[in-house]
Design a protein with these regions (language model features):
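Cytoplasmic juxtamembrane regions at transmembrane-helix boundaries
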Residues: 89-113, 164-180
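Individual transmembrane alpha-helix segments
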Residues: 69-98
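Perimembrane loop-to-helix junctions flanking transmembrane segments
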Residues: 47-69
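Alpha-helical transmembrane segments
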Residues: 130-148
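N-terminal signal-anchor transmembrane alpha helix
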Residues: 13-48
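Cytosolic juxtamembrane amphipathic/interface segments immediately preceding
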Residues: 4-20, 63-64, 166-173
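Terminal transmembrane helical module of multi-pass membrane proteins
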Residues: 143-202
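Hydrophobic alpha-helical transmembrane segments of integral membrane proteins
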Residues: 101-136, 180-197
Length: 202
């Protein structure tokens, strides 16, 4: 009996490692794809985009600062992460959790790679600090999304194991834990996006 239980634990550990490796591989591949996409852009397009990004990093005076516009920009920047987190959370109670998480990670990683590559074009001495903070916060947000997707995938794995053992699909404690983790993840995105937006004002 103990040996059977040990084998089951070992199989679960292997499954967890496979999930993490799968998500990490998808994230890196899509991120590199975004970098390569920018590298393949026409030079004139890159130049135009570079000009717009540099103007964004030029900073604004406090006299021209609009608080409501600043808040709206944070909400707009957080929106893709919010939508991704909520979709991953909902589908974590289904059997297609891995597929949905893979797709969303790939999309977010690709666009993050594009954004980082475009901002990296502006890493001149004048805007180095702002651009560096922006890139660090953006990449950190992507890693937070991956970690959240990983924890939701483990929740989905636990549900499948419970169903296979003829037990209740999920307990109220598990649901509360998943909900609190979702709220904490959304809060983390708001903080990172706020810091990223402040970098544009430096």
């Amino acid at each position: 009996m103990r040996r059977k239980h040990a084998l089951k634990l070992s199989a679960n550990d292997i499954e967890r490692k496979k999930i993490f490796f799968q998500f990490a591989l998808m994230l890196m591949a899509a991120f590199i794809g975004g970098l390569c996409f920018v590298a393949a852009l026409d030079t004139s397009i890159s130049h135009d985009v570079r000009g717009k990004i540099i103007s964004s990093f030029s900073g604004i005076s406090l006299r021209d600062f609009d608080l409501m516009q600043f808040v709206r920009s944070i909400i707009t920047a957080c929106l893709p992460y919010f939508v991704s987190v909520l979709i991953i959370f909902v589908f974590s109670f289904s059997y297609v959790s891995y597929v949905v998480s893979d797709i969303l990670l790939a999309l977010n990683s690709f666009f993050t790679g594009v954004l980082v590559a475009l901002v990296a074009l502006c890493l001149t001495p004048a805007y180095f600090l702002s651009a560096a903070i922006f890139i660090v916060c953006t990449v950190t947000s992507l890693l937070v999304l991956m970690y959240f997707a990983y924890t939701c995938a483990l929740l989905s794995l636990g549900i499948r194991l419970r169903v296979s053992n003829g037990r209740m699909i999920f307990s109220g404690k598990k649901l509360l834990y998943a909900t609190l983790k979702t709220i904490a993840t959304l809060g983390t995105f708001i903080i990172l996006t706020f810091i990223r937006s402040i970098a544009l004002l430096i």
